[in-house]
């Protein structure tokens, strides 16, 4: 196993019985066709369940709608990015030349709005969406390697130094949270999100995401430079439709 993966494994406090899962979790689609996006998809669901369980235990007096707000704060891209920075994850990521090398710098500049000011010349290693997605992929990899209990334990370790309180709820009321609260107040199931298209170069993709409410027969779409942002855009479009129809 590569030294950077050994260091990451030690920080995760999980020894993989299948090292290939760790390898894939740290491989971006710009590097190989055997990339981490399916693990990210799985890890996203495991993360939400584990965080929901954590909040259910810690904030026992909080009602459902407010729990959803706190959870949204904890699992949003910026929060996951900050958690990922505490791990040697950026060093272990395998990225294509367009992200890790000095080539195609002009192409990268076209996505400059997605980079943080201190990321110039970093080759995308500290790009928030890449690191946040990779962290979700790691959670998915641990789940496949050792089951839900191990993945849940990892999530608990990741959040052990994060202050979790009802005060977090105001910062998290984004479009997805607002839509989920609207549905919950009407005793309806959460919306369904699905990536329906991904276009553009690997280092500068655009995700088209569909947001559906089967009970109402409604579907709206949104596009952005990451899956999470695409979901927010789709949720915002759905909220606009609900408002326009006076629902």
Curated annotation (Swiss-Prot):
Chain spans, region Disordered: 104-124
Q: What is its EC number?
A: 3.1.26.3
Every DRBM domain range: 174-244
| Annotated Pfam families | dsrm (PF00035), Ribonucleas_3_3 (PF14622)
Q: Which GO terms describe its molecular function?
A: double-stranded RNA binding; metal ion binding; ribonuclease III activity; rRNA binding
Reaction(s) catalysed by this chain's protein:
Endonucleolytic cleavage to 5'-phosphomonoester
* Protein's name according to its UniProt entry: Ribonuclease 3
Cross-referenced PROSITE patterns, in alphabetical order?
A: DS_RBD, RNASE_3_1, RNASE_3_2
GO cellular component, alphabetical, reads: cytoplasm
> Which cofactors does this gene product need?
Mg(2+)
As for what it does, the entry says: Digests double-stranded RNA. Involved in the processing of primary rRNA transcript to yield the immediate precursors to the large and small rRNAs (23S and 16S). Processes some mRNAs, and tRNAs when they are encoded in the rRNA operon. Processes pre-crRNA and tracrRNA of type II CRISPR loci if present in the organism.
| Residue intervals of the RNase III domain | 5-147
What is the phylogenetic placement of the source species in the record? Bacteria, Pseudomonadati, Pseudomonadota, Betaproteobacteria, Burkholderiales
Task: Provide the species name.
Answer: Verminephrobacter eiseniae (strain EF01-2)
Keyword line: Cytoplasm, Endonuclease, Hydrolase, Magnesium, Metal-binding, mRNA processing, Nuclease, RNA-binding, rRNA processing, rRNA-binding, tRNA processing
Catalytic center at which residues?
44, 136
The subunit structure is:
Homodimer.
